[in-house]
C-alpha cells in the first residue's frame, strides 16, 4: 500500500510542512502566537578544531 502523500507526488518533508501549517491555521488565536513563534527552524553549525 502506497502512502497518500506519495500518491499525490509529495515528499514526506513537504507533506509534513503542509500538515503543520494546517494545524497552526486551525489553532485558536490565543495559542496561534506561540505556535507561529516556534514554527521557524533553528540550525547551529559547529566547526571542529583539528589539533
UniProtKB/Swiss-Prot annotation:
Per the record, the domain of life is Eukaryota
This chain's source organism reads Bos taurus
Q: At which residues is N6-acetyllysine found?
A: 21, 32, 37, 44
Q: Which family does it belong to?
A: Belongs to the eukaryotic ATPase epsilon family.
What is the name of this protein? ATP synthase F(1) complex subunit epsilon, mitochondrial
- State its role: Subunit epsilon, of the mitochondrial membrane ATP synthase complex (F(1)F(0) ATP synthase or Complex V) that produces ATP from ADP in the presence of a proton gradient across the membrane which is generated by electron transport complexes of the respiratory chain. ATP synthase complex consist of a soluble F(1) head domain - the catalytic core - and a membrane F(1) domain - the membrane proton channel. These two domains are linked by a central stalk rotating inside the F(1) region and a stationary peripheral stalk.
Known Gene3D superfamilies for this protein?
ATP synthase, F1 complex, epsilon subunit superfamily, mitochondrial
Report the subcellular localization: Mitochondrion; Mitochondrion inner membrane
Assembly, in brief, is: Component of the ATP synthase complex composed at least of ATP5F1A/subunit alpha, ATP5F1B/subunit beta, ATP5MC1/subunit c (homooctomer), MT-ATP6/subunit a, MT-ATP8/subunit 8, ATP5ME/subunit e, ATP5MF/subunit f, ATP5MG/subunit g, ATP5MK/subunit k, ATP5MJ/subunit j, ATP5F1C/subunit gamma, ATP5F1D/subunit delta, ATP5F1E/subunit epsilon, ATP5PF/subunit F6, ATP5PB/subunit b, ATP5PD/subunit d, ATP5PO/subunit OSCP.
N6-succinyllysine sites (modified residues): 21, 32, 37
Q: Which PANTHER family match?
A: ATP SYNTHASE EPSILON CHAIN, MITOCHONDRIAL, ATP SYNTHASE SUBUNIT EPSILON, MITOCHONDRIAL
